[in-house]
Amino acid sequence: MMKKGLLAGALTATVLFGTCAVDVPGIISPKTAEAASQLTDGIGGRAYLNSNGAILVTKIQLPSSTQVSNGTAYIYSGFSGGTESDIGFQYSDKYNVWKPYMKVGSKGQDQVQYLEGGSQFTNTKGFRPGSTVQLTIYKNLNGNTRATYWGTNNAGYNGRLISEISKTNVGSISKWKALATVATTGSRQSIKSNFSTSFTNITIDNKAITPVIDTQDFAKVTVSGNSVSLSVVKN
């Protein structure tokens, strides 16, 4: 389960790390220099995806090993603009799995409905470390925001998870994003982290999108074509 304090306070407005300390309005130029700002309430790397489209598809390579202390690891995408969203994975150290995570605007994980696969990818189960998951995010599907995950759980089950938050009614957005972060409600100085991930074959509305590096805060972000790799390392 998500730590209750994680979504309270400062994170309520910023979602997780959906916005940085210095806001970047609208479309980001590919010539924009990598931001020097720190992420709020944690550390990590972020790339923006210059598209205001409706459907994102990507394959995410989950870390085979995740070493994090004094914080919670996340790997996620989502959209920014009129509504901020974080959609992807939260690491469970207790079960050594990556659990589905979803937040859209003010609606959080407690309002997620699992339309398929909930018993195979939630509670004590989740996505297997080291596996590849295909993630599809629908910004607005009949007034709802939906995420579809195709992957393998920690018991070896291969299948689909469909998660949805209803009545989000998302309108226009300015961009999408890809992040790997460690969030904390305490001091960011105390965080220790070592994990890596990648988003490959990123498309939005069936068009390949080249990520633009935004933030590297105790992180290394590398772009290749329509793919991006992120490593979050802090000793």
From Swiss-Prot:
InterPro entries: YrpD (IPR029143), YrpD-like_sf (IPR038682). This is Uncharacterized protein YrpD. To B.subtilis YncM. It holds the Pfam family YrpD. It comes from Bacillus subtilis (strain 168). CDD domains: YncM_like (cd13427).
